[in-house]
Amino acid sequence: MKKNIHPDYKLVIASCSCGNVIEVNSTLGCNINLDVCSNCHPAYTNKKREAATGGRVDRFKKRFSFLESSKAE
């Protein structure tokens, strides 16, 4: 490698919201905050998340349910 043409590498700490801390080398030099890492991501942990059971149709029916009750009377 040629001298004095490559950028300086600095130690960067990437901290996840789950508390996991990863140390990496980077030319940026600023710390990184992560939302998801390999310790807490469902694809890596094989944990399934519960999806929202109701959809747009359920929200619509709930919002306009007062119209059906007035028709029945």
Swiss-Prot record:
Belongs to the bacterial ribosomal protein bL31 family. Type A subfamily. This is Large ribosomal subunit protein bL31. One of its GO terms (molecular function) is metal ion binding. Part of the 50S ribosomal subunit. Keywords: Metal-binding, Ribonucleoprotein, Ribosomal protein, RNA-binding, rRNA-binding, Zinc. One of its GO terms (biological process) is translation. InterPro entries: Ribosomal_bL28/bL31-like_sf (IPR034704), Ribosomal_bL31 (IPR002150), Ribosomal_bL31_A (IPR027491), Ribosomal_bL31_sf (IPR042105). Pfam families: Ribosomal_L31. The keyword Ribosomal protein applies. It comes from the Bacteria. Zn(2+) binds at C16, C18, C37, C40.
